[in-house]
């Protein structure tokens, strides 16, 4: 598959703030993640990032994020 880049905004619920979600996304799905902006408080987290990988890996990674309870929105 061809390499692809996605710009995404991830919104984390409070129970996942202390989990290594971005690390796992990068490691388990072989996605290069560049954090562009992050805001984390005691009750939520929001991260804007760029994700680079094969299209199939990106789709699998995004699906996994959603399964974890993370809201994933594309950034134009």
Placement of each model-derived feature along the sequence:
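Long, contiguous binding/interaction regions
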Residues: 1-76
């Amino acid at each position: 598959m061809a390499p692809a880049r996605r710009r995404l905004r991830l919104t984390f619920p409070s129970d996942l703030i202390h989990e290594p979600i971005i690390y796992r996304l990068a490691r388990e799905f072989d996605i290069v993640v560049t954090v562009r902006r992050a805001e984390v408080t005691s009750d939520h987290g929001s991260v804007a990032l760029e994700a680079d990988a094969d299209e199939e890996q990106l789709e699998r990674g995004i699906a996994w994020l959603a399964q974890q309870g993370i809201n994933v929105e594309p950034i134009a």
